[in-house]
Amino acid sequence: LLNGKKRNIYADKLAKKSLVLIKKFLKEKKYKNIENLKKLMIASFFAGEAISFSMVGLIHPFSAALSSIFRIPHCLSNCIVFRGLKSYYIKEYNFLFNCFNHQKITIENIIKINNNKIEKLYLSTMKHEKPLKNHLGKNFKKKLNYDIVYNIFKSI
């Protein structure tokens, strides 16, 4: 589930538990009832803990940038950014958006990215060195240069 150099058994267990709960939630026909929403909240907690204990992922540096620049909730910015990172997470992307389609959940693009915002988004993304280095290696700045970050944000 998790990848990166700082993975550990504790984070892996949290991630697996989160995924089990998310799958149950998304497969329910009436997912918006209070009991299912409680399960999703717990799953979200487990996922957040897994990420914080393993420092993995490209989504969160991009998502944090999007949240801070556009003042949108973290969960929504994760979903929006996920579309731009599809090539890094093909299997996970397909699973999540198949579940969304099954539930008729749409992720609206509520942001307008212009050239004035791109520089801020780039700088805000790149300051998250630990997860970027963990996911892409110590030369992450070569693998994730301005043009690549620009194209990822423009694709969402």
What are these regions (language model features)?
Residues 64-123:
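Active-site pocket-lining segment
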Residues 1-54, 141:
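Carboxylate- and glycine-rich phosphate/diphosphate-binding segment that chelates Mg2+/Mn2+
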Residues 32-38, 71-73, 144-148:
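Structural motif
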Residues 22-25, 44-48, 62, 66, ...:
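Buried hydrophobic packing segments
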Residues 8, 12, 48-56, 68-75, ...:
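Short, surface-exposed loop/turn motifs that are enriched in glycine and acidic residues
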Residues 101-156:
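C-terminal charged capping/lid subdomain of soluble metabolic enzymes
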Residues 18, 58, 77-81:
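Catalytic-loop motifs flanking and including active-site residues across diverse enzymes
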